[in-house]
C-alpha cells in the first residue's frame, strides 16, 4: 500500500460534506493498494443543457479523486493543491452513474501526477484525465 495517511472510506466521505463534492453526489467507493475510486451520478446535477454528462462534472470528479489521493500521500502539516488538469472526453453518458479510478503516474517530494479514468456503468472509458498537484508544507 502506497498511502501515508490511513483513512477509512467513511472518513474520506465525511471530508466532503457541504462541498461541491457532496453537491455533485460524488462518493468514494474503494481505496486499493495504489488506487482510489469514486462514483458520481449522471443526473440533473451533472448534466449539461443537452442531457449529457457535463465535461466539467467529469473534470470535478477527476480533480476530487486526484486531490484526495494526493492528500493521502502527504504527512501531517502538508496539503496538496492542483496545478493542472487535462481531460479528454471519449464517450457521452446520459444517465446512471460514472466511476472514476485514480492511479499515480509520479510521486515526488513536491509534485505528483495522477491519471484518472472515468468509466460508464458498462465499463467503457468515457474520459481520461491527468492531474498535476503540488505538495505544500
Swiss-Prot record:
Q: Which GO terms describe its biological process?
A: enterobactin biosynthetic process
Q: Which GO terms describe its molecular function?
A: 1,4-dihydroxy-2-naphthoyl-CoA thioesterase activity
Pfam families named in the record: 4HBT
Catalytic positions are 63 (nucleophile or proton acceptor)
Q: Which biological pathway?
A: Siderophore biosynthesis; enterobactin biosynthesis
Keyword terms of this UniProt record: Cytoplasm, Hydrolase
Gene3D superfamilies of this UniProt entry?
A: Hotdog Thioesterase (3.10.129.10)
The cellular location(s) given in this protein's UniProt record come to: Cytoplasm
The entry assigns this protein to a family as follows: Belongs to the thioesterase PaaI family.
Give the protein's function.
Required for optimal enterobactin synthesis. Acts as a proofreading enzyme that prevents EntB misacylation by hydrolyzing the thioester bound existing between EntB and wrongly charged molecules.
What is the recorded name of this protein?
A: Proofreading thioesterase EntH
Amino acid at each position: 500500500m502506497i498511502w501515508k495517511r490511513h483513512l477509512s472510506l467513511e472518513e474520506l466521505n465525511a471530508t466532503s460534506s457541504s462541498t461541491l463534492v457532496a453537491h455533485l453526489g460524488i462518493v468514494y467507493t474503494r481505496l486499493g493498494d495504489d488506487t482510489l475510486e469514486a462514483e458520481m451520478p449522471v443526473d440533473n446535477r451533472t448534466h449539461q443543457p443537452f442531457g449529457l454528462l457535463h465535461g466539467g462534472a467529469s473534470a470535478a470528479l477527476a480533480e476530487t479523486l486526484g486531490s484526495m489521493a494526493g492528500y493521502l500521500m502527504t504527512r501531517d502539516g502538508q496539503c496538496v493543491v492542483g496545478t493542472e488538469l487535462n481531460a479528454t472526453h471519449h464517450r457521452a453518458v446520459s444517465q446512471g452513474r460514472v466511476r472514476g479510478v485514480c492511479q499515480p503516474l509520479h510521486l515526488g517530494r513536491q509534485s505528483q501526477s495522477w491519471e484518472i479514468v472515468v468509466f460508464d456503468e458498462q465499463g467503457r472509458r468515457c474520459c481520461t484525465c491527468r492531474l498535476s498537484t503540488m505538495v505544500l508544507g
